[in-house]
Amino acid sequence: MEFVLESISPTKKKLTISLTPDEVNTALDSVIAQYKKDLSLPGFRKGKVPNSVVFKKFSEEITNKATEETLKIYIKEIFQKEHIKPLCNLLTEDTDFIRNESFSSTLTFEVLPEITFPNYEGLEVHQDVVKVTDEEVAELLKNIQLAMAELVDVKEDRSPQNGDVVDVDYKGFENGSPVTDVSGEHFVLTLGQRQALEDFEQLVKTAKVGEEKVGIVNFPRDYAHKGLAGKSIDFHIKLNSIKTSILPELDADFAKKAGYEDIDKLREAAKVQLEIKKKQNAKSNAMKKLINGLLEQVTFDVPETMLETRIERILGDHNIRSQQTVQVQTGEERSESEEELYNNAKVEALAVLRPQIFLMALAEKEKLVVMEQEVERALYNMAIRARQDYNKFRDAYYRSGLVYELQDHLLAEKAMELIYNKANVVEVEQ
């Protein structure tokens, strides 16, 4: 076996593997032997079927298996010898072995760019001193109250107001004709939370339960739905219900429902929770300063496939949001051309990938590794947060290949932790 390894770019390589006719024949015969071992055919004893008969019967399967298995072995051997770690699936030519003929196959793959690392030890970074105020504790307790609040129907004869949860049917009309897709039944929103256009909320506030109202809703010129941008649409609405939140009292019963002995213990736990979160945020901000400072000192190419995959994912998420059919929602997302969307997605992708690539390359330099149990622990925590069955969640991650992205993420985290631990962290007052 001979091979030629070429660099197409700083992040892309091409590998050409060549085999002699004898090596091809040996590989084919090895697979034929596997097939004939337990094969029984009329006129032949088990395991004694001639090679030519076996190959004739299973030629396609044998050829494919011999080619794939042999290439897999040689590729692994070459990668180990050349210390290569490909980033993504290998793109190989669709060729198979032919008996008594030489064989050549070319594959391309991407690798991390070579980075000349600046000094990353002993860097000084400022980190905010963490303090938790009584006001912040009170705000957290208020949020817990809201989470445990009971929604009840408003009994008095009144129109809805900010803070109320309303259930509305609506239809949009332009010049007396219904506007396509601008309609909905039992649209639920909390007034005053910018969950809908201001004109729509104001129209809802003019109605009482069971009443129908008509009014004009003006859509911003930069509204995400281009067919509605800048238009004034006649809306017919019907208010189905008004609900308001009844907050529980901050007393011993409330504390016990939240899982604590008394209200003082709940306040203490809330303060600890805030301290932990603030410390995590302060550390995260310090880490961002460190990595951004290091990235300013280096230039490197981002692997093309990695970049395009990330851009496609960002654009896909944008399309999902754009296709959600609540046409009365606020028009804060701007209408953008495809080119603008792509360019913005590229900027967003690079902001994520450049730190990740730098840290992955540093992890390789420092010989950092991610253990299997670390991956399993991360998957378990993710499943818990997503409220999904762990085994199903884990299987889905492995089947989709997302587990490899998770491994890269964990490796980058380890490298970032290394930089932070080697840094001179100076705590400063906010």
Swiss-Prot record:
Top-tier EC class: isomerase
Database matches in PROSITE patterns: FKBP_PPIASE
UniProtKB keywords: Cell cycle, Cell division, Chaperone, Cytoplasm, Isomerase, Rotamase
GO biological process, one term: 'de novo' cotranslational protein folding
CC per GO annotation: cytoplasm
Disulphide bonds in the chain: none
UniProt EC number: 5.2.1.8
One Pfam entry name: FKBP_C
Source domain of life: Bacteria
Compartment(s): Cytoplasm
Known catalytic reactions: [protein]-peptidylproline (omega=180) = [protein]-peptidylproline (omega=0)
Domain spans labelled PPIase FKBP-type: 163-248
Gene3D superfamilies (alphabetical): 3.10.50.40, Trigger factor ribosome-binding domain, Trigger factor, C-terminal domain
Record-level Gene Ontology MF annotations: peptidyl-prolyl cis-trans isomerase activity; protein folding chaperone; ribosome binding
Task of the protein: Involved in protein export. Acts as a chaperone by maintaining the newly synthesized protein in an open conformation. Functions as a peptidyl-prolyl cis-trans isomerase.
Family to which the UniProt record says this protein belongs: Belongs to the FKBP-type PPIase family. Tig subfamily.
Domain notes: Consists of 3 domains; the N-terminus binds the ribosome, the middle domain has PPIase activity, while the C-terminus has intrinsic chaperone activity on its own.
UniProt name for this protein: Trigger factor
Source species of the chain: Lawsonia intracellularis (strain PHE/MN1-00)
Source organism phylogeny: Bacteria, Pseudomonadati, Thermodesulfobacteriota, Desulfovibrionia, Desulfovibrionales
Gene designation: tig
